[in-house]
């Protein structure tokens, strides 16, 4: 939202939304069937409610975000993807057709994206901890293991045109 709000999407080649992978990211798929709800609720980076914690642990929250981005910015679903970034500092990566790449990064505090949505012109200063730039050293960005997180495969069935399919998700 922050990077695209006043821009045309014509120059966009690809947008990656990042997910931490939640508390189950480093767990083997074999151990998934024995996961307890209490484990899935213990997000390593964010303090969240129960539903969003479970959605994060399964990557369903990212499925919702991809669908939202597609509709809000009128993007082709094929130009959107999800990457795993366990530290949760980078929230989106926008790749442009001209070769430039823009990263949206901030501290793991939901006040920041909410604040910037409410005060979208950027003239107000938020009172919270800023991201220490050195935390961006050695960024870890990985493709989603779709066998481990099969819910992301729903995105393969999203029609190019707006339909009620997305509402049913």
Locations of the language-model features?
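Catalytic, metal-anchored helix/loop core of enzyme active sites in primary metabolism
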Residues: 1-169
């Amino acid at each position: 939202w922050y990077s695209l709000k006043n821009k045309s999407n014509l120059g966009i080649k690809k947008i990656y939304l990042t997910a931490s992978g939640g508390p189950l990211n480093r767990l083997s798929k074999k151990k998934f069937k024995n996961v307890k709800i209490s484990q899935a609720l213990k997000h390593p980076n964010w303090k969240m409610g129960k539903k969003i914690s479970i959605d994060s642990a399964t990557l369903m929250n990212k499925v919702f975000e991809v669908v939202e981005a597609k509709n809000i910015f009128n993007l082709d679903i094929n130009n959107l993807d999800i990457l795993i970034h366990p530290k949760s500092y980078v929230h989106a990566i926008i790749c442009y057709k001209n070769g430039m790449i823009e990263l949206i990064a901030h501290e793991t505090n939901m006040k920041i994206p909410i604040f910037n949505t409410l005060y979208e012109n950027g003239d107000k200063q938020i009172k919270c901890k800023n991201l220490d730039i050195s935390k961006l050293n050695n960024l870890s960005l990985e493709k989603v293991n779709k066998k481990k997180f099969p819910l992301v495969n729903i995105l393969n069935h999203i029609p190019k045109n707006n339909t009620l399919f997305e509402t049913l998700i």
